[in-house]
């Protein structure tokens, strides 16, 4: 003979009713259909409860947050959790018989106007939308402000760079113009004769000097400038002309001051020989041929 769902078979083969456990307790193992004769009562595990006597198992407590409702009482081993009203922006549907669902659903635009809780929440949302600016608009305004600041900074740096280059260019142009004007002024004050543009180096040779008396200096061309500096005063040979191809003995008219300057420029070391080759007197002019050594330039 088979045992019922609440019976177990004892050692003599008879069907015996399973042990009953009180509230907050359950059997340690399933009992029924001839099995579970050694089961005993234990306390319900956490998050489970049992409110009546019986051999059945403890039931799982309800979670109010899962069904979008406010929890009013916690779950115990003898009682289930108690849930209250729906959370904000949620409502419970009403069935045809007047009963309401246990679970609350979100409010939408299609929610009937009879649901007072959804009507109140939608009005609050509209007021918030008018008072609080959207996050996207704030982000766009911030990005736009940063772009404007970066653009102004870039334009300022570019302007300073261009101004620096322009000032440098103007300074270079003024310097070149000043150098050119200075060169033109020097050329106008000290013109270079065509035959004296280059001055090659000369070896030690014999020079020819021509000395004039002081009474004829007034009519001389070398002293006709009345103290103004001439090109001859800047030459190392002191009135001696420079030859293009070779040293040529040519009479040159010089003053006593030129002779003194030339004599002081000759080095004192070494023997100096003065030999009078020819002395010619032609009127008031005396020509002397004097051998001398010219220092290399």
Curated annotation (Swiss-Prot):
Sequence ranges on the Cytoplasmic membrane side: 160-297
GO function term, MF aspect, one: tumor necrosis factor receptor activity
Domain of life: Eukaryota
Protein keywords: Developmental protein, Differentiation, Disulfide bond, Glycoprotein, Membrane, Receptor, Repeat, Transmembrane, Transmembrane helix
Stretches of the chain found on the membrane's Extracellular side: 1-138
Keyword Transmembrane appears in the UniProt entry: yes
Gene Ontology CC terms, in alphabetical order: plasma membrane
Positions annotated as TNFR-Cys repeat: 2-41, 43-83, 85-118
Biological process per Gene Ontology, one example term: positive regulation of canonical NF-kappaB signal transduction
Residue ranges crossing the lipid bilayer per the database entry: 139-159
Assembly information from the UniProt record: Associates with TRAF1, TRAF3 and TRAF6.
PANTHER family xrefs: TNFR-CYS DOMAIN-CONTAINING PROTEIN, TUMOR NECROSIS FACTOR RECEPTOR SUPERFAMILY MEMBER 27
Protein name: Tumor necrosis factor receptor superfamily member 27
